[in-house]
UniProtKB/Swiss-Prot annotation:
PANTHER family cross-referenced by the UniProt entry: ASPARTYL AMINOPEPTIDASE
PTM-bearing positions, type N-acetylmethionine: M1
Species annotation: Dictyostelium discoideum (Social amoeba)
Note on how the cofactor is bound: Binds 2 Zn(2+) ions per subunit.
Listed name of the protein: Aspartyl aminopeptidase
Family: Belongs to the peptidase M18 family.
Region (Disordered): 188-213
UniProt xrefs under InterPro entries: Peptidase_M18, Peptidase_M18_dom2
Length: 484
């Protein structure tokens, strides 16, 4: 296991630096620029050249990085690995100022399908992006991560709920998931730190627009923490997208250092494997490549993907269109260019990379007897006859063949007939674009908990699989065959 530890430590460093999708995208943006990738803007014309590498972001929470093969021609395919940057959490509400029996609380909204009971009695904080007014009157989006524990959702003592261990822990997501941030003892601090009000009630003002100010909608103590972290005044804070997150760092654990205990394994785990896999592709390989190698990390998978930065948006088609237009518009007629875009879609292949369920030692009956992935035994191909996953015989064979040729362990998974099945961006993309797709992911335990578990060795296995996919897919014999 020791040989896998360096890569696992890099991964947990990434996790700790990525408390929100915005931070994850910023992390990858900095790495890509340091590795020679050119930062594109979707608001400007692109100048795409063969054997060059590029990336762009959308909404600060979605990123697409691609390397153009040195032998790329009109109609050639995109070899894509797609994952997502978001995880279930609590979002701070637009009006978050809540008070109850002497406590100041922060109103939050559930995002995705989390195991919300795991958020009780944790040391919590906030992270995300804040719209800040600059001295020249312009506005800027700044990332923020308050690293100390400022929030807590306390559980109810067993003395006040004697049946909790027999009847189960029951909670209401509206009433019982409201983090406390301070007590009313902080009221003198509020009146001192803001000029808008001297009480916790809404300020009296003759300006009707003041009811929409940040100091009216959020507790002053929260705004003060944000302003201190951002280096601005409270009045400069215009709006924000903040998520609640755990302050406990990710860690390598187990007696033999086999496990990673971490938040957001789903799906920063496969986001990391996909992007590092692309970065590890050799320059000599890219020079001889006939396709475009592309990693896309979408946002909003946990809530259906229906956003400009989600997998339902036409980002893949937009990218293919702009790359082909930039490279070949001067030498092709318009109708030929449209045909080449269609050909590119038909010649493309996509790995939908999302974490998978490992066999649980305490709940073995919940798993299909012949499909029980284990931690540290390699990535998992995910199947579902009802198309909750996009894998089929030919597309899964691509992965099996790559793994066999490169000594990468691989596993297979499907749910029991009497069990519901989750889904991924795989069926969305394959159904929208007709791109051949396979669903894979590293195995993990406690999916959608605030604290999840995955395998140390699987980080390396996942990276190796994505790298070899990018380096070898175009030349696989099956792609030249008539399996359509």
């Amino acid at each position: 296991m020791e040989q896998y530890l360096p890569q696992a430590k890099e991964f947990i460093s990434f996790i700790d630096k990525s408390p929100s999708p915005y931070h994850a995208v910023q992390y990858f943006s900095e790495i890509l620029k340091s590795k020679g990738f050119i930062h594109l803007s979707e608001k400007q014309m692109w100048d795409i050249q063969p054997n060059k590498k590029y990336f762009f972001t959308r909404n600060q929470s979605c990123i697409s990085a691609f390397a153009v093969g040195g032998k790329y021609k009109p109609g050639n395919g995109f070899n894509i690995a797609a994952a997502h940057t978001d995880s279930p959490n609590f979002k701070v509400r637009p009006v978050s100022k809540v008070e109850s029996v002497g406590y100041q609380q922060v109103g939050v909204e559930t995002y995705g399908g989390g195991l919300w009971y795991t958020w009780f009695d944790r040391d919590l904080t906030v992270a995300g992006r804040v719209i800040v007014k600059s001295g020249d009157g312009s506005y800027e989006s700044k990332l923020v991560h308050i690293k100390k524990p400022i929030l807590r959702i306390p559980s109810l003592a067993i003395h006040l709920d004697r049946s909790v261990n027999t009847d189960g822990f029951k909670y209401n997501t509206q009433n019982h998931l409201v983090p406390m941030i301070a007590s009313k003892l902080s009221e003198p601090v509020e009146s001192k730190s803001t000029t808008t009000t001297t009480t916790t009630e809404s300020p009296k003002t003759s300006d009707p627009q003041d009811v929409n100010s940040s100091t009216t909608k959020h507790h002053a103590v929260l705004l003060e923490l944000l302003s201190k972290e951002l280096g601005c005044s409270v009045g400069d804070i215009q709006n924000f997208d903040l998520s609640v997150c755990d302050t406990q760092p990710a860690a390598i654990g187990g007696a033999l250092d086999e496990f990673i205990f971490s938040p957001r394994c789903d799906n920063l785990g496969m986001s990391y494997c996909a992007m590092i896999g692309l970065l590890n592709v050799k320059e000599s390989t890219l020079a001889q490549e006939e396709n475009v190698l592309n990693v896309i990390l979408f946002d909003n998978e946990e809530v259906g993907s229906s956003s400009p930065q989600g997998a339902c948006a036409p980002l893949i088609n937009d990218t293919i269109s702009r790359v082909n237009s930039s490279m070949f518009a001067s030498t092709c007629k318009p109708h030929e260019l449209n045909n080449f875009i269609d050909l590119t879609l038909r010649n493309s292949f996509l790995i939908s990379a999302d974490m998978a369920h490992a066999i649980h030692p305490n709940y073995t009956a919940n798993h299909e007897p012949l499909h029980r992935p284990a931690l540290n035994k390699g990535p998992v191909i995910k199947y579902n006859a009802n198309l909750r996953y996009a894998s089929n015989g030919p597309t899964s064979f691509v992965i099996l063949d790559i793994c066999k040729k490169n000594g990468i362990p691989i596993q297979e998974f499907l749910v029991k007939n009497d069990s519901p099945c989750g889904s991924t961006i795989g069926p969305i993309i394959s159904g929208t674009y007709g791109i051949r797709t396979v669903d894979i992911g590293n195995p993990q335990l406690s999916m959608h908990s605030i604290r999840e578990t995955c395998g140390v060795a699987d980080i390396t296995h996942g990276i190796n699989l994505i790298q070899k996919y990018f380096e070898q897919f175009t030349k696989l014999d099956i792609i030249k065959s008539d399996l359509e």
